[in-house]
Swiss-Prot record:
The keyword Phosphoprotein does not apply. GO terms for molecular function: metalloendopeptidase activity; zinc ion binding. InterPro entries: HtpX_protease, Pept_M48_protease_HtpX, Peptidase_M48. Zn(2+) binds at H144, H148, E224. Keywords: Cell inner membrane, Cell membrane, Hydrolase, Membrane, Metal-binding, Metalloprotease, Protease, Transmembrane, Transmembrane helix, Zinc. One of its GO terms (biological process) is proteolysis. It comes from Pelodictyon phaeoclathratiforme (strain DSM 5477 / BU-1). It is an enzyme of class 3 (hydrolase). Belongs to the peptidase M48B family. Its EC number is 3.4.24.-. This is Protease HtpX homolog. Binds 1 zinc ion per subunit. It comes from the Bacteria.
Length: 291
């Protein structure tokens, strides 16, 4: 879940910078100089949309380390770190890709995998998770994160976000142009966008961006089921993953990081639309019914 939230926040920041830069450089004035050029607008939206998502992907590992204070284990200094590194090595080898970086950080029970590719990935585990589960359960969580990497979930998320970014920019500019044209009623023939265009485009980008995040979270929840199934396959047994999920469910909400509580682990209702993970009971049921 931390992986998805960090990606979305980074994507928002990058898109904001690119959008403001485009406005300063006069791209919007060019697009509306002789009426709205739909073809050029679509190209512009795709360049900014996919550019923003791929920049976010490239920054994902660095941002994850910075935001959590995760320390990569280069030389294990304890038996716990030796076990952690060797477990990730064994699981990644079984999955068929080079061992990712392994990091540990102080915090509530959590773990995540991130990185732009299998060969440049990171698996990070919190001390809270290591101390609240037995080793078999921790191994199942690690297998889950390794499965995320093996399934290419970060790249999939990037492509989905790129498409959504494109539509957010494209539709917001069209609506902004229509609003601006209505407000000005041809009183300004210069073709330069007015204040109505800027306000409307920013408002629409925020609104459509929120709606787009719901779509991203929907796909994220689907990928979680695949990662659970992948963990069961890597472990050769679905029981450890089920036990790990139940262990998470037995923790008090106050022991969980905020993003876990917002992911359906300790909440529901409308917020479920913005959850990166399905409810624990649904994940457990899916594992128990798998053949």
């Amino acid at each position: 879940m931390k992986r998805v939230i960090l990606f979305l926040l980074t994507n928002f920041a990058v898109m904001l910078v690119l959008s403001v830069t485009a406005r300063i450089l006069g791209v919007d004035r060019f697009l509306t100089s002789n009426g709205l050029n739909m073809g050029m607008l679509l190209v512009f939206a795709a360049l900014i949309g996919f550019g923003g998502s791929f920049i976010s992907l490239l920054m994902s590992k660095t941002m994850a380390k910075w935001s959590t204070g995760a320390q990569v284990i280069k030389q294990p200094s304890s038996q716990e770190e030796v076990w952690l590194v060797e477990t990730v090595r064994r699981l990644s080898t079984k999955a068929g890709f080079a061992m990712p970086e392994v990091a540990i950080y102080d915090g509530a029970p959590n773990a995540f995998a991130t990185g732009p590719s299998k060969s440049r990935s990171l698996v990070a585990v919190s001390t809270g998770l290591l101390h609240s589960m037995d080793r078999k359960q921790v191994e199942a969580v690690l297998a889950h994160e390794v499965s995320h990497i093996n399934n290419g979930d970060m790249v999939t998320l990037t492509l989905i976000q790129g498409v959504l970014n494109t539509f957010v920019i494209f539709l917001s500019r069209i609506i902004a142009y229509a609003v601006d044209s209505f407000l000005r009623r041809d009183e300004d023939e210069s073709g330069s966008p007015g204040i109505g265009y800027w306000i409307s485009s920013i408002a629409c980008e925020i609104l459509f961006g929120i709606l787009a995040s719901i779509v991203v979270m929907f796909f994220s929840r689907k990928r979680e089921y695949r990662a659970d199934a992948g963990a069961a396959a890597l472990m050769g047994d679905r029981r450890p993953m089920i036990d790990a999920l139940r262990a998470l469910g037995n923790l008090d909400a106050g022991q969980l990081p905020k993003e876990m509580a917002a992911s359906g682990i300790a909440g529901g209702g409308m917020m479920a639309l913005f959850s990166s993970h399905p409810p624990l009971e649904s994940r457990i049921a899916a594992l128990e019914s798998a053949r």
